[in-house]
Regions:
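Acidic/His- and Gly-rich active-site-bordering loop/insert found
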Residues: 2-108, 129-134
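Short glycine/serine- and small hydrophobic-enriched flexible loop segments
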Residues: 25, 122-129, 214-220
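Fold-independent oxyanion-binding glycine-rich loops
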Residues: 60, 78-80, 102, 110, ...
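Structural motif
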Residues: 72-75, 103-104, 139, 166-169, ...
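Glycine/serine-rich anion-binding loops at beta->alpha junctions
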Residues: 103-119, 198
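Acidic/histidine-rich catalytic neighborhood of metal-dependent amide-processing enzymes
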Residues: 113-183, 187
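Midchain, well-structured core segments that form catalytic/ion-binding scaffolds
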Residues: 155-247
């Protein structure tokens, strides 16, 4: 079969049952942020079974598997941690069963993002089997703690020199769309300082909540203004308050 797309398609069809089994077994393992050890072990075993050229776990706990040895370094990334399931009784299907119905796999992580990892592991394997890795090394990275500490996993990989790819493909769910960019992201903490006083004599103190109130209103107005000036490629920026706390 000379057409590379046809070769990949045929191999994908052949490996579909294995991909489904692999994904269902990952879904069956609870893997919230900072609790990924068991699911990392399962993914590592799959890479080993498929004969990846190199498989390792870095100091943070990220799993990295390589196929090919060319000079061009391509990373295909997916975070292997998930958010929690909340109240399991509110689910219409068992979040840890990986139920298959009408060609769809249901469960925590099926879409975000263990499905992407299953596709990446087998995609790299298929690319090698189809003879498409001439001059290329592909690293599949199953990264940890993305849900709680977005960016920490790749910050570690780059700062510690674990891997320095030329190209990165991210397997976040996009309904199979190809996205060529993403808005930047920042986390900021704003503090206001008060002075305590008895509730019957508030004039003797400084209320830090009152000092925060206009800041909250300003942030809400900023989000409205950002929506009025969308970028032609990336769309509108957003800003949101996600947490307020008093020590």
């Amino acid at each position: 079969m000379s057409d590379p797309i046809a070769r990949v398609g045929a191999l994908a069809d052949r490996y579909t049952p294995d991909v489904v089994t692999f994904l269902r077994e990952m879904i069956a393992i609870p893997s919230e942020s900072a609790g990924e050890r068991e699911v990392i072990a399962r993914a590592r075993a799959e890479m080993g079974r498929l004969g990846f050229d190199e498989v390792k776990v870095d100091g943070l706990g990220n799993l990295l598997g390589r196929v090919g040895s060319g000079p061009l370094v391509v990373a295909i990334d997916g975070h292997i941690d998930t958010v929690g399931v909340g109240d399991p009784s509110t689910w219409t299907r068992d979040p840890y069963r990986g139920e298959v119905a009408d060609g769809v796999i249901y469960g925590r992580g099926a879409s975000d993002q263990e499905g992407g990892i299953a596709a990446a592991v087998y995609g790299a394997h298929i690319a090698r089997e189809a003879g498409l890795l001439d001059g290329v090394q592909v690293w599949v990275t199953a990264t940890v703690m993305e849900e709680d500490c977005d960016g920490l996993c790749w910050q570690y990989i780059l700062r510690e020199g674990v891997l320095k790819p030329d190209v990165v493909v991210i397997t976040e769910p996009t309904n199979l769309g190809v996205y060529r960019g993403h808005r930047g992201r920042m986390e900021m903490e704003v503090r206001t300082q008060g002075r305590s006083a008895h509730g019957s004599m508030p004039e003797r103190g400084v209320n830090a909540v009152y000092k925060m109130a206009p800041i909250v209103a300003d942030i809400e107005r900023l989000n409205q203004r950002l929506g009025e000036r969308p970028d032609a490629f990336l769309g509108a920026g957003t800003v949101a308050i996600s947490q307020i706390r008093s020590p």
